[in-house]
From Swiss-Prot:
It holds the Pfam family Ribosomal_L35p. GO terms for cellular component: cytosolic large ribosomal subunit. InterPro entries: Ribosomal_bL35, Ribosomal_bL35-like, Ribosomal_bL35_CS, Ribosomal_bL35_sf. This is Large ribosomal subunit protein bL35. Keywords: Ribonucleoprotein, Ribosomal protein. PANTHER family: 54S RIBOSOMAL PROTEIN BL35M, LARGE RIBOSOMAL SUBUNIT PROTEIN BL35M. The keyword DNA damage does not apply. PROSITE patterns: RIBOSOMAL_L35 (PS00936). GO terms for biological process: translation. Belongs to the bacterial ribosomal protein bL35 family. One of its GO terms (molecular function) is structural constituent of ribosome.
Amino acid sequence: MPKIKTVRGAAKRFKKTASGGFKRKHANLRHILTKKSTKRKRHLRPKSMVSKGDLGLVVRCLPYA
């Protein structure tokens, strides 16, 4: 049986935690930042966890994570 390919875009976006979850970065913090408030940018800064509903998709994209 052939090896399953990892989705390379997903491998760059998600990191697996020790407890089995996945860390992710928030969107909307790359450009056009002048119109966004400091509070909004500050809250987008820390990493977040992938939600339970999306976890299956991430696991399927990263078979060896």
